[in-house]
From Swiss-Prot:
Keywords: Cytoplasm, Disulfide bond, DNA-binding, Endonuclease, Hydrolase, Magnesium, Manganese, Metal-binding, Nuclease, RNA-binding. Nuclease that specifically degrades the RNA of RNA-DNA hybrids. Endonucleolytically removes RNA primers from the Okazaki fragments of lagging strand synthesis on its own. In the presence of Mn(2+) or Co(2+) can also cleave an RNA-RNA hybrid; the dsRNase activity is 10- 100-fold lower than RNase H activity. Complements the temperature-sensitive phenotype of an E.coli double rnhA/rnhB (RNase H) disruption mutant. Changing residue 58 to A: RNase H and dsRNase activity increase slightly, decreased thermostability. Changing residue 52 to Q: Loss of RNase H activity, loss of dsRNase activity. Does not complement E.coli double deletion mutant. CDD domains: RNase_HI_like. PANTHER family: POLYNUCLEOTIDYL TRANSFERASE, RIBONUCLEASE H-LIKE SUPERFAMILY PROTEIN, RIBONUCLEASE HI. The protein is hyperthermostable, melting temperature (TM) for wild-type is 102 degrees Celsius, for the double Cys mutant is 93 degrees Celsius and for a C-terminal deletion of 6 residues is 77 degrees Celsius. This is Ribonuclease HI. InterPro entries: RNase_HI-like (IPR053576), RNaseH-like_sf (IPR012337), RNaseH_domain (IPR002156), RNaseH_sf (IPR036397). The gene is rnhA. Mn(2+) 1 binds at residues 7, 52, 76. Its main location: cytoplasm. It comes from Sulfurisphaera tokodaii (strain DSM 16993 / JCM 10545 / NBRC 100140 / 7) (Sulfolobus tokodaii). It catalyses: Endonucleolytic cleavage to 5'-phosphomonoester.
Length: 149
C-alpha cells in the first residue's frame, strides 16, 4: 500500500503571509519527501488553503511521475479533504482552479483521500515549516515543487 501525506501553512498571517507546503510518500521501503512555495509571499492569494491544495497537487503530480496508482492520501485539512471527496462545495475563487487540477489528478491516480488529525501528519507539517524558513531566509524564491529524495 502506498500512502502520501500533505500539509500547508501560511505564516505569519493568513491570508497575506508566506504560503508553503510539504509532502511525503511512503513507497515500499522508501520515503520520498518534497516541499515548495505555493504563492508569491505576502500576496492576497497567499493563504493556508492555497498552500494545502498546492501541497496536494505537488504530491499527486509526483505520484503520477513515479507511476503510482490507487494511493491513499492523507491530510489534516478538513476543508480540502471534504471538498475533494464532494462533501463541501468550493466557493473561494482563488481555490477553484487548484481544486479542478487536484480532482483531475485524483481521478488519474484513482486516489483515496482521508482526513487525519494533525498529530498523524507531522512529517508533512515539518517539511512545510522547512520550506517556510527557506523562504524567510531568501533561499527559496520560486513558486513550485521541490523533490528532496
Amino acid at each position: 500500500m502506498i500512502i502520501g501525506y500533505f500539509d500547508g501553512l501560511c505564516e505569519p498571517k493568513n491570508p497575506g503571509g508566506i504560503a508553503t507546503f510539504g509532502f511525503v510518500i511512503y513507497l515500499d521501503n522508501r520515503k520520498i519527501e518534497g516541499y515548495g512555495l505555493a504563492e508569491k509571499p505576502f500576496s492576497i492569494n497567499s493563504t493556508n488553503n492555497v498552500a494545502e491544495y498546492s501541497g496536494l497537487i505537488c504530491l499527486m503530480e509526483t505520484m503520477l511521475r513515479l507511476g503510482i496508482s490507487s494511493p491513499i492520501i492523507k491530510g489534516d485539512s478538513q476543508l480540502v479533504i471534504k471538498q475533494m471527496n464532494g462533501e463541501y462545495k468550493v466557493k473561494a475563487k482563488r481555490i477553484i482552479p487548484l481544486y479542478e487540477k487536484a480532482i483531475e489528478l485524483k481521478k488519474k491516480l484513482n486516489a483515496t483521500l482521508i482526513w487525519v488529525p494533525r498529530e498523524e501528519n507531522k512529517e508533512a507539517d515539518r517539511l512545510s515549516r522547512v520550506a517556510y524558513e527557506l523562504v524567510r531566509r531568501g533561499k527559496l524564491r520560486d513558486i513550485g515543487c521541490i523533490i528532496l529524495t
